[in-house]
Regions:
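Nucleotidyltransferase catalytic core that binds NTPs
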Residues: 1-162
Length: 162
């Protein structure tokens, strides 16, 4: 019998309450979640001092007490830029997940076009519109205004920037 493993991927620059809500809903639906923190050299997180390594470490800290969540990092530096790299990116992500033949990835996304791209490639993807009216872009641009939305493990990074 197959077991579904939820997959939530993103830049998480920074992780915020909308991401946490999506991860929690994925966990409730599937039981286990793999959170994939992705990025590349000089990406939008890197430009504010929040590179892939830091985001991965903060995400690990966020879920360190949760045995149902596994955090992985996906370095996209050598991949073609979105949207051209979908197939290579997906292949690398699936290799990273290292699922058994009885485990089936089910993607949870907050971008409708991501769900469409995954469906085209034969994967289950649940689109869940953004909640809380927040985005990582808003937080990067106005961290003090949106500090209450930042995931706890990422808060100190922004406090140090003040």
């Amino acid at each position: 019998m197959n077991q579904t493993i939820a997959v939530v991927f993103g830049t998480f620059a920074p992780m915020h309450k909308g991401h946490l809500d999506l991860i929690e809903r994925a966990k409730l639906a599937c039981g286990q979640v793999c959170v994939v923190v992705s990025g590349y050299d000089r990406d939008r997180g890197d430009r504010i001092g929040l590179d892939l390594t830091k985001r991965f470490q903060f995400a690990q800290e966020q879920f360190k007490e949760d045995d149902l969540v596994r955090v992985c990092a996906l370095d996209e530096t050598d991949l073609p830029a979105y949207p051209d790299g979908w197939d290579l990116w997906l292949e690398r992500l699936l290799d990273l997940l290292n699922l058994s033949e009885h485990q089936v990835p089910v993607f949870y996304v907050s971008e409708e076009e991501y769900a469409q791209e995954l469906h085209i490639r034969g994967y289950q993807a649940h689109f869940s519109p953004r909640k809380f009216g927040i985005s990582a872009t808003l937080i990067r641009e106005h961290p003090q205004q949106y500090q209450d939305y930042i995931a706890p493990a990422f808060v100190d990074f922004f406090a140090e920037q003040e």
